[in-house]
Amino acid sequence: MLDPSSSEEESDEILEEESGKEVLGSAASGARLSPSRTNEGSAGSAGMGGSGAGAGVGAGGGGGSGASSGGGAGGLQPSSRAGGGRPSSPSPSVVSEKEKEELERLQKEEEERKKRLQLYVFVMRCIAYPFNAKQPTDMARRPRKISKQQLQTVKDRFQAFLNGETQIVADEAFMNAVQSYYEVFLKSDRVARMVQSGGCSANDSREVFKKHIEKRVRSLPEIDGLSKETVLSSWMAKFDAIYRGEEDPRKQQARMTASAASELILSKEQLYEMFQNILGIKKFEHQLLYNACQLDNPDEQAAQIRRELDGRLQMADQIARERKFPKFVSKEMENMYIEELKSSVNLLMANLESMPVSKGGEFKLQKLKRSHNASIIDMGEESENQLSKSDVLLSFSLEVVIMEVQGLKSLAPNRIVYCTMEVEGGEKLQTDQAEASKPTWGTQGDFSTTHALPAVKVKLFTESTGVLALEDKELGRVILHPTPNSPKQSEWHKMTVSKNCPDQDLKIKLAVRMDKPQNMKHSGYLWTIGKNVWKRWKKRFFVLVQVSQYTFAMCSYREKKAEPQELLQLDGYTVDYTDPQPGLEGGRAFFNAVKEGDTVIFASDDEQDRILWVQAMYRATGQSHKPVPPTQVQKLKPRAETCLSMDAPISQFYADRAQKHGMDEFISSNPCNFDHASLFEMVQRLTLDHRLNDSYSCLGWFSPGQVFVLDEYCARNGVRGCHRHLCYLRDLLERAENGAMIDPTLLHYSFAFCASHVHGNRPDGIGTVTVEEKERFEEIKERLRVLLENQITHFRYCFPFGRPEGALKATLSLLERVLMKDIVTPVPQEEVKTVIRKCLEQAALVNYSRLSEYAKIEENVGRLITPAKKLEDTIRLAELVIEVLQQNEEHHAEAFAWWSDLMVEHAETFLSLFAVDMDAALEVQPPDTWDSFPLFQLLNDFLRTDYNLCNGKFHKHLQDLFAPLVVRYVDLMESSIAQSIHRGFERESWEPVNNGSGTSEDLFWKLDALQTFIRDLHWPEEEFGKHLEQRLKLMASDMIESCVKRTRIAFEVKLQKTSRSTDFRVPQSICTMFNVMVDAKAQSTKLCSMEMGQEHQYHSKIDELIEETVKEMITLLVAKFVTILEGVLAKLSRYDEGTLFSSFLSFTVKAASKYVDVPKPGMDVADAYVTFVRHSQDVLRDKVNEEMYIERLFDQWYNSSMNVICTWLTDRMDLQLHIYQLKTLIRMVKKTYRDFRLQGVLDSTLNSKTYETIRNRLTVEERTASVSEGGGLQGISMKDSDEEDEEDD
């Protein structure tokens, strides 16, 4: 805002130059304005009262003369162009038509400009002197909205983070969360639309991310010493760092603080500037209006309000007299309407009366308090409330500053002098002491007095040098009678010199400043005469005193008196200029105050003083007639003369300047003559446009400053509350219908107010309802219903990701309110449910249509679509469908909590639309292909975890669709596995593969994969799922049984083909077959057991089969080992006593030993057997995976071996063992015993009775042999010894 006291002449010169240029330009073009020049005239100098040849087109409406002088048809004819050139258009009629349209357009623009200027005058007055409203401090702060450019910047920052281009350290979980947020939220077209609608703020982005990560963090595993809340806080801090980028957080915080402050309280200058922008007012126009309206003068503004309120009361009386009422819904409301008008004015009067009588500079908008308890003023009783003299006591502050004294010539230079000062009846003050050679002080004394004409005494003293002197000597004195209008600067005054002072020309320089009390509006000397007071024509000192906002008094004072001598209460008087009265001498400029039965004549000494007095009294009387001076001495002159002659006050100067520029009509217009309903409608609409285009995400909410101005305008100009809210609703609806984000809570407030008013509930105390209000309300109610239903239908796009927070819930609440027939009876829930159901059914179609369209855009329609591609697209579409349903649950379910069953229906409808595309894709798939199972798994995994959708309509359809496929798949898999078993065992090499053979591994893998696949389907229908499980368990049992039997047969065949001598080595295949049994037993536990307690039959059956088979295999292998042992014993049987071989062998050895050293029978047989046993033990121990089976095998093998040896010895009980037999057996038995003990066979098994029998027999035979054989057994003995152990090793 420009300073009102700034120089006006410069802007005036600029305006005059522009005006001159325009006129010249018009003349040069043959009195025809070009469109561009016309625009300049309209924008820059419109309203200046142009009188040039063509000024009427551009600015004729502004000054009142342009339209008549320049608006004639001659100036617009094509033939009037300068130079007589060929016309640019071949058709003059076409040209004239265009120019006519241009003229009409310019006239409309001019009318609009005038309307805005007039509206700005009313708004300025509301800002300058508010007495009804204040800027609210409890409104929620609106966050700054995100622009398209800022959204792109945020996207780039997150993309840079994901690309690793930032310094922010993050783990994989956070990276995944940000990636998901970036893809789902930031890149969403719904977010772009929200930004475009002006409803997206940084807080929205942050809250969506916070909600997005909460589930992720909750699902993370617990970490010791690290709480989930800590992780959340850390992630949010990193998010903020990414979102902020490289920007200094301190700058951002400072900017946010500043913006928040501007959202709260605005100064007057800021409010002026805001509404200049809203109404398109230029700075110089504001300056002219500001000065001419005297907006910095609270007295003038209060007087303007009083005049307006008086005019509104008169208008109410006129309406009552002429019966020009608005059309009400009831005839009885007409009288009530008049009462309401008067009551509203009385309330405003009470508010005005409660305002403090203060200066404009001390007035603060935010300190304004509205008085609701002030008594209502009854204008009819004002004359009875007479003032007493004590009611108008004034208090003045005086400053007396003594500067210096001149004329002290007789005093010695070093004599001390000083001054005293006093106000009559008050205390006395003294200056510092000074030497007579330099009597200067600059001392100020402050006094207060209740005298309107106080006497200020200043005395000059010098210190007495005499010994007997009791008092200092007075040199001189001066007595002054200051008034608030006296000069404030220091002046020289001649002092009255004391008798004994030789210096007769003493002067003192001092200043006396008398401040004007806040309730003193003007003062000065006037000549006056009246009928009831001031009955003699005499010059008196007058003070215009404001007792309250509605009570003023003209008081005359004498010197040294606190109370007025006489006073005149100005209620009901009208002041005006008059001509000089004959017979009254004294006074030059006359004016009077007239009231029925009384006239008071005043006269001042000059014209300027008269104008000031009339202006002050005009404000005080509250009269509607504005006095106009008969002659205006002050005229606008060139700058050089302006400063030299100022006979009129500055307010008249500004008024003249405003008149010159065509502004006087806006300033002097009577507000009561305007249709403030339409004017307010305009200013509210323009304010809303301005608000929606500022940098805040306001959602339609006005700023506190805007609310304040609109509130004040409505109160001051009598705009009905219902009209205000109906206009607001209409404007908000228009914006919402055009895509702007509007807070439904705001709509709810205004709608509830209007509904309450229309149904007679008097929300603002107004009981009258006009037909227009009711009709408009019904129209807006229908529009609002359509809008709300449309928003609910498009809830994913109108409230993306649940933003703004709570908006969808508020929309549903508002819809319920709109559906109410009145404000008392709640609408039946079924009716609301029907409406919402219809909306959500349409929403399903809208959401799926947009989703499928989005999917097709991604899939590049136009390519040849194969069944596989169609299935792939359907799976992608299913992922998007699930994502939509999850977002609905996450962001919108809370709003629909009261209608959760309808949201379930919405989801089912949405899925049914998808089912059509899904069925079509599955129909074209070739038979016996299983690529569609991932689609089932994807959908079923989502549906089965949703309480509302599990086993719902679509879920059952999905099961019905895939159940035959699953059955067919299991059948084919069973056949395939059976064939693989048959073929596999035919070609089985029994080479070890993992835990078994190739065939068994393949079998178990297929069975496990099949069961895992079916289990991962998580079939939701319990009975069919149980059937599938039983089917697969039975299949596994049958397959494993077949595997076990085939292995048992192969085992036996393999053993039959192996050697029966000690050369036998346990082949790898034998161990593999054992391992197949081991693996079969382990797999059967997993593959054949049912979870239910009564369903263990499959598992127990196959378990028993495996155990029996393993026993048989162990028995067969032990039998093989026994056969080999029997072969060894058969060789030893040759040495039985009495046999031919034994006799021949003994004879041959004895005969040969006489000639050569014949070697005795060695231990080859025993060593071969021991080697066989050890090798077989090692192979079995190393290759067979089941320890229990090894132990059982070794136990049985040991026992069987001992039994065979024992039987063999028992058969030779009557025979003495040959020395060779004895040595071989001792070695075999001892080594077998030790080897089996090393393999872990228990001592209880090793030291069996059979073993003891064998040991005893061999011990006895050993003793016998040692007696009969001279050489003994050559160190072989049943006794244990270390040497033997070393030898064996």
Curated annotation (Swiss-Prot):
Domain spans labelled C2: 378-493
Bias (Gly residues): 44-75
CDD domains: PH_CADPS
Any one GO molecular function term: calcium ion binding
InterPro entries: C2_dom, CAPS, MUN_dom, Munc13_1, PH-like_dom_sf, PH_domain
Subcellular location: Synapse; Cytoplasmic vesicle, Secretory vesicle, Neuronal dense core vesicle membrane
Keyword DNA-binding listed: no
Region (Mediates targeting and association with DCVs): 1113-1289
Disulfide bonds: none
Source organism, top-level taxon: Eukaryota
Complex formation: Interacts with the dopamine receptor DRD2. Interacts with RASL10B. Homodimer.
Domain commentary: The PH domain is essential for regulated exocytosis and binds phospholipids and plasma membrane. It however does not mediate binding to DCVs.
Protein name: Calcium-dependent secretion activator 1
Name of the coding gene: Cadps
